[in-house]
Amino acid sequence: MNILAIGAHPDDLDISCGGTLLRFGQAGENVVMCVVTDGRAHPLGDPEQVSARRRKEAQASADIVGAELVWLGFPDGRLTDDIPARLRFIELLMRVSPDLIITHSPDDYHSDHMLTSRLVTATIQMAWAPPPELAGDPVRKQVPVAFMPPAYGINFLPEEYVDISDVWDQKLQMALSHRSQYLPGPDYDAPLQEPLEQYAFARYTRITDEFYGQQCWCRYAEAFRWWRAADRLVPRRLLP
C-alpha cells in the first residue's frame, strides 16, 4: 500500500502517528510523510535558518521510518484554504496515489492543523477528476482518511487503535529528532542527557501513548478516527 501521512508542522506526524508509520514501514509498505508548512514560526532565530533546521529534523525523522519526506513549504502559521493550496494538495495526491491518508482531526486546536485537515478532505475527491492544468494520473479509487487525535486527545473518541509497544523506542527517537522544539539552543546537536523525560517531547509522547494503550490493553498505542463520507470507507482493516 501507499501510505500518505500529512501533517501541518514538521513534528506533528512523529508525535501523533509515528509508531503507526514505523509499523507500516516494517511491513514493507510505501510510506510518504508530507509536511505542509515550513516551520519558520519559532520565537527565536532567523526564520530562514529555523526553517532549514526544521526541514533537516523532519528528514532525520523520516529516515528512521524509511519514508519519503515531502516538504510543501507553505508559510508556518499562515496556511489558507485557497485555490493555489488546493492545487498543490491535488498534485500531491496524484503523485502518491495513496491507499490510505492519515492527517489531523478537523477540530484540532491550531489553525494550520484544521486547515490541513480541510485541504485533505476538500481535494481528495478533486483528485478523482483533477483540473486540466494538472498533469498526471487521477486517483480513481477509494481512499480512506484516518484522523489523528488533536492535542491532548480533547473531544476525541477513538475508533481504532494501533499497538506500537514494539516500536515505541524508535518513535521516541523520531520525536526527539525535533530538537529545535524542546532545546534552548543554539547547540541543537549536543548529545541528549538522561533521563530523556526531562524533555517535554519525551514526556508528552509517553503519557499520550500510555493513555491510549490503557484503553486497548497494551503498553503503548496510537488512536484514530475515520472520516465517514462517501467513497472513503472500505470493508477491511487498513491500519497495522
For every predicted segment, state its role.
Residues 1-4, 45, 81-240:
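Metal-dependent de-N-acetylase/amidase catalytic core
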Residues 1-96, 225-226, 231, 235-237:
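Active-site rim/loop-helix segments in enzyme catalytic domains that contact anionic ligands
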